[in-house]
């Protein structure tokens, strides 16, 4: 029997949103400050990209959102900073979700960046390695941060 305390969205099969996007829209409209999507990283590439875009929808509205899986964690930064302790056996990647992300700084890693411009047509931030606690910050634009098992 279903737990009545957990809301269930009854959605039509044919709709403009994916199920994940509908859930993210609902959570944003309900005023949630953080959204965690589990088991949304595997399977079809088109769905993964759609899930990342759903994170962007939340981010544009000031809501922190992440995709969490067994072997990876994905989240976005916009005019923000984050500190991530070393995760042995995992890489750290940063990519531009928007056309460009300005003033990207990464320290505590093998390949640091200082006040860099990161664009979505050049993957300069892929597969970095921890040398200590990583500090990541960015200005204008949306930065995609990925911790993935090597």
What are the roles of these predicted feature ranges?
Residues 12, 62-66, 93, 100-101:
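A glycine-rich helix N-cap at a beta->alpha junction
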Residues 44-48, 74-78, 113:
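Short, well-ordered, mixed-charge alpha-helical segments that flank or form enzyme active sites
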Residues 77-150:
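Long, charged alpha-helical interface segments
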Residues 1-60:
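Acidic/Gly/His-enriched mid-domain segments of enzyme catalytic cores or analogous surface patches
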Residues 4-6, 31-33, 61-64, 89, ...:
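Short coil/turn connectors at secondary-structure junctions
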Residues 40, 70, 148:
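Cofactor-binding loop segments of dinucleotide-utilizing enzymes, especially the Rossmann-like FAD-
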Residues 56-87, 95:
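Class I SAM-dependent methyltransferase SAM-binding "motif I" and its flanking Rossmann-like core
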